[in-house]
């Protein structure tokens, strides 16, 4: 059984502030295949604090640096493709072929699309040549998202 009870916070894998394990069940076998941790308010606060600290340097990074990081992430994704396919298959109780061809491939497609769009994105736009009015896009802060359906 996989042990995935640590959180990645501030560049390190850390144990939760309080043990609160949850077994992840494969719907097709009804058997547990992994143990994860339920985060606490303290864990969330640690992650948000670390993200706020990281925002200081991230907000000053260039488009090229951000593209480089996404390309590195995409390279790691590709190297771990079969591992992710297997994890998605177990989590969803789905056939491996469908997990690989539909789910894992869509994650890769999203990263590839983000890279293309970031390369094209204008962080600073002038309204017209006659004015000095501009739109400047900057990171504004840390966001917490709760999304449905594993997305």
Language model features: what each stretch is:
Residues 1-131:
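N-terminal Rossmann-like NAD(P)+-binding subdomain of aldehyde/semialdehyde dehydrogenases
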Residues 124-151:
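Conserved small-residue-rich beta-alpha loop and adjacent elements
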């Amino acid at each position: 059984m996989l042990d995935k009870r640590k959180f990645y916070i501030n560049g390190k894998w850390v144990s939760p502030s309080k043990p609160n394990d949850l077994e992840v069940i494969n719907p097709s076998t009804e058997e547990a295949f992994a143990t994860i941790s339920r985060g606490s308010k303290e864990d969330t606060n640690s992650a948000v604090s670390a993200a706020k600290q990281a925002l200081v340097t991230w907000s000053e990074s260039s488009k090229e640096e951000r593209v480089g990081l996404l390309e590195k992430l995409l390279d790691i994704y590709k190297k771990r493709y079969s591992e992710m396919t297997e994890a998605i298959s177990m989590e969803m109780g789905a056939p491996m072929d469908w997990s690989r061809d539909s789910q894992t491939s869509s994650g890769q497609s999203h990263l590839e699309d983000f890279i293309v769009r970031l390369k094209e994105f204008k962080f600073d736009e002038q309204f017209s040549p006659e004015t000095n009015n501009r739109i400047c896009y900057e990171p504004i802060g840390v966001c917490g998202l709760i999304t449905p359906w594993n997305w």
